[in-house]
Amino acid sequence: MAIQTRKMSDWLAQNGAAITAAAKTSMLKAVNDEVAQLQDGVFIMTHRWKTYTDDFPLAIEPRKWVASYQNAGEIADGVLLVEGGHHLVIAPTETQLPWAGGNSDTGAFRTGDRLAAMQDWAGKDNTAKIIAASKTGAVTNTEAYAAGFCNKYSRVNGNGKGLTAGRWWLPSVAELMMIYANKAKINHALSLIDGAQQLSESWYWASTESGSSSAWFLSLTGGTLDGWSDKSYSGKVRPVSAFLR
């Protein structure tokens, strides 16, 4: 059977009512406003509230993030990293804490295999399981321990909106590796945020476990990944989140 073809111009001439009229400038603006959030890159995330009161989340290129935003009371949620179909919001600040108060079987992703650990993207799910497994002798759910600290972390604007407590987690190994690979760009964006702390040349905890007494640890100095770090050891903790309304 022959395939029938038709000129688009002829179809438009007969079906003009089916086409929504839009000014070229409006269409270009809409496309340009959205495309930056779809492409790989590093952005500063905020929930606007000063000029607009809708608390809408925005991803702003670092070169467009100016002091006047913060002087007007805007708060940066963190640094948005988009890469290869994954995205993370890296908190502006960090702390140093033990992973847990003792040996724990949390149900979070556990492996002693380095390659398997590097494929773990389930930081959010890991954190929820770590917190749920908290118990006497192996506390994990308070701000004194890595997962609990991340879960209680919060960044909000003047309306109390933003990335509130319960929306942050302890990154998995794969999430930490993505942060490490983009450390210089992330630190540049962090340098533009008032009160932010840059990623340091230190060991950072992952939510990926390697045993009941150990979890994975990533060095942001050279990318060394250690799977036998005792959970009682005090390491760097940097909460992460997602681009959320």
Give, region by region, the residue ranges found by the protein language model.
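Short, compositionally biased
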Residues: 2-164, 231-245
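Hydrophobic core segments of beta-strands in well-ordered, beta-rich domains
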Residues: 89, 168-171
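C-terminal, surface-exposed recognition/capping segments
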Residues: 2-9, 166, 173-245
